[in-house]
Amino acid sequence: MKTDTPSLETPQAARLRRRQLIRQLLERDKTPLAILFMAAVVGTLVGLAAVAFDKGVAWLQNQRMGALVHTADNYPLLLTVAFLCSAVLAMFGYFLVRKYAPEAGGSGIPEIEGALEDQRPVRWWRVLPVKFFGGLGTLGGGMVLGREGPTVQIGGNIGRMVLDIFRLKGDEARHTLLATGAAAGLAAAFNAPLAGILFIIEEMRPQFRYTLISIKAVFIGVIMSTIMYRIFNHEVALIDVGKLSDAPLNTLWLYLILGIIFGIFGPIFNKWVLGMQDLLHRVHGGNITKWVLMGGAIGGLCGLLGFVAPATSGGGFNLIPIATAGNFSMGMLVFIFVARVITTLLCFSSGAPGGIFAPMLALGTVLGTAFGMVAVELFPQYHLEAGTFAIAGMGALLAASIRAPLTGIILVLEMTDNYQLILPMIITGLGATLLAQFTGGKPLYSAILARTLAKQEAEQLARSKAASASENT
C-alpha cells in the first residue's frame, strides 16, 4: 500500500517565494512604522527639554535666593532686592510672550487642544524658544505657576517640529505626533507616565483621535520622555510625603463629603480665573508696556511673599509635603489657602507662561489637610490621619476644575507613591467631578480655548472688513 509523500519545494520556487515576500514588504505602507519611530524621537526630545527646563528653573531660583543672602543684614534692602529680582525675571517672560509669541502665554494646554482640532496654528519655531525662556523667567522668579503647562506646549510643538523636519505627510501623523508630544510633556513634568497617557485620553478626549497607531505612539513617547527624566533625576516619587495609613471602610463617607466641597469650589474657582482674566485685560488694555509692567508687579509681589511667607508663593511642590505632615495650624492653613488662591488667580490669569496643575494640587492639599484636621477632632474614634485627606484633596480640585478625575487620581498616586489610598481618592474625585458637572460651567481649559477661538474669529473678521474697505477705496 503506497502512501503519498509531500513534494519538496524546488530551489527555484523557494527563491521566487522569497522575492515575492520581500516585494510585499517593500510595497507595504511604512507610515505607521514611521510614526512609531518618530514618536520615540519626540518622546526623547521632550524628555530632554523637560529636564533642561526643570534644571533651569531650579538654577534661577537658587541664584535669586543667593542674591538675597548678600543683603540679609539690611531688611529694607532685602525686601527691595527680593521684589526687583522676581519682577525683572517676570517682566522678561511677559515681554517675550507678548512681543514674539502671544500663543505661548498662559498654560498652553488649550492651544494644543485647539491645534488637535485644527483650529489653532502651531508655530513651533517661535513658540519653543519663547515658552522655554519665558517660562524660565516667570517660574524662576517664584510666581505661582506650574511647569506642566510649558512642558505640554513645548512637547506638542516638538511633535510638530519633528513632523515638519522629517516631512511626514497625512493628518494621522500630524495629529498623532502632536498628541504624543503633549502626553510626553506631562509625563516628564511630574515623572508620571501613566498620568501622561490618561491626560491625552481623558482631558483631550474630544480632540484625540483614538486609533491603534495613535495610542501606541503616545505610549512610546511617554516611555521615552520618562526614561529621559529618570536618567537625570532619581527614580523616586516626585513628592515625598512618606507612607500614609490606609482609610478604613467606615470612614469613606468623609471622603465623599470632601469631594462635595471640592465639587462646589471647582466651578467657582474657574469663574474666578475667567473673571480675573477680564479684570487684568482691562488693566493693561492690550498695551505691551502696561502688560509687562503689570506682570513685573505681580512677579515682584510673589518674590516678596517668597521671602516673607514662602508657603504662599512658588509652584507648591515644597508646600505639599509640609502641609501633609501636619506642620501648619488651622489658622495658618486658612491663610495659606486664601493667599494662594489670590496669587494663583493673579499669576495664571495675567497670561504669564506657566501652568496651573501644580498650584491646584497645592490648593487641594491645603484644603484637604484642613478638612482632615477637622475630621480628626470631630471623630476621634476613627483614628484618622489628616494626611490621607491631603492626598485625596490633591487631585480633587483638578478633577472638579478640568473634569479629568482619572488623570488627577493617577497623577497624585504616581507623584506620592501612596497607592493604598486609591479607593478614597476615587470617591473624592468622583464626588468632586459629578457635583461640578451638575452645577454647570465648562471645564477650565475648554472655557479658555473657547475664549481664544472667539478672539481669533473677531480678529479675522476685523481684518476681512479692513481688507474690504481698502479694496472699495
UniProtKB/Swiss-Prot annotation:
Changing residue 203 to C/I/L/V: Abolishes proton and chloride transport. Keywords: Antiport, Cell inner membrane, Cell membrane, Chloride, Ion transport, Membrane, Stress response, Transmembrane, Transmembrane helix, Transport. A motif (Selectivity filter part_3) lies at residues 355-359. Signal peptide: none annotated. The record marks 148 as: Mediates proton transfer from the outer aqueous phase to the interior of the protein. It comes from Escherichia coli (strain K12). NCBIfam families: PRK05277.1. Residues 70-76, 233-252, 310-329, 377-386 are periplasmic. Changing residue 107 to A: Uncouples chloride transport from proton transport. It is a multi-pass membrane protein. Proton-coupled chloride transporter. Functions as antiport system and exchanges two chloride ions for 1 proton. Probably acts as an electrical shunt for an outwardly-directed proton pump that is linked to amino acid decarboxylation, as part of the extreme acid resistance (XAR) response. Residues 1-32, 117-123, 167-176, 202-214, 282-287, 439-473 are cytoplasmic. It catalyses: 2 chloride(in) + H(+)(out) = 2 chloride(out) + H(+)(in). Changing residue 445 to L: Alters stoichiometry of proton/chloride exchange. Homodimer. Changing residue 203 to D/H: No effect on proton and chloride transport. It is found in: Cell inner membrane. This is H(+)/Cl(-) exchange transporter ClcA. Residues 109-116, 177-189, 193-201, 387-401, 402-404, 405-416, 417-421 dip into the membrane without crossing it. Changing residue 203 to K/R: Decreased proton and chloride transport. A motif (Selectivity filter part_2) lies at residues 146-150. Pfam families: Voltage_CLC (PF00654). GO terms for molecular function: chloride:proton antiporter activity; identical protein binding; voltage-gated chloride channel activity. GO terms for cellular component: plasma membrane. A motif (Selectivity filter part_1) lies at residues 106-110. SUPFAM superfamilies: Clc chloride channel. The record marks 203 as: Mediates proton transfer from the protein to the inner aqueous phase.
